[in-house]
């Protein structure tokens, strides 16, 4: 776990969520000193924001796909 001000750009949603869950467990169980807990909390905020961004991107992509799927062209046969 790195406590940088930014996350690695290539961290997946699943990896970020797993790390966030581990941080929450450690803080809830009081397994860390106050200073370490504060650093973990800061990292947790970065992870939460990253997860929210990934979810928003996925939602927008799904909406775009759905719009494309719903706007298919239907050809009707006409008599000539």
Curated annotation (Swiss-Prot):
Catalytic activity: Exonucleolytic cleavage in either 5'- to 3'- or 3'- to 5'-direction to yield nucleoside 5'-phosphates
GO cellular component term of the entry, any: exodeoxyribonuclease VII complex
Pfam families referenced in this protein's UniProt entry, alphabetically: Exonuc_VII_S
GO molecular function, one term: exodeoxyribonuclease VII activity
InterPro entries: Exonuc_VII_S, Exonuc_VII_ssu_sf
KW Transit peptide (keyword) present: no
Subcellular location: Cytoplasm
GO biological process assignments: DNA catabolic process
Function in brief: Bidirectionally degrades single-stranded DNA into large acid-insoluble oligonucleotides, which are then degraded further into small acid-soluble oligonucleotides.
Subunit (UniProt): Heterooligomer composed of large and small subunits.
Record family assignment: Belongs to the XseB family.
NCBIfam families: PRK00977.1-4 (NF002140), xseB (TIGR01280)
Protein name as catalogued: Exodeoxyribonuclease 7 small subunit
The species this protein was found in: Rickettsia massiliae (strain Mtu5)
Origin organism lineage: Bacteria, Pseudomonadati, Pseudomonadota, Alphaproteobacteria, Rickettsiales
Gene that specifies this protein: xseB
């Amino acid at each position: 776990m790195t406590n940088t001000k930014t996350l690695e750009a290539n961290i997946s949603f699943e990896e970020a969520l797993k790390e966030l869950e581990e941080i929450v467990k450690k803080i809830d169980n009081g397994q860390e000193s106050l200073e370490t807990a504060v650093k973990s909390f800061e990292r947790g905020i970065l992870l939460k924001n990253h997860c929210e961004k990934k979810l928003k991107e996925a939602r927008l992509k799904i909406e775009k796909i759905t719009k494309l799927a719903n706007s298919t062209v239907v050809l009707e046969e006409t008599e000539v």
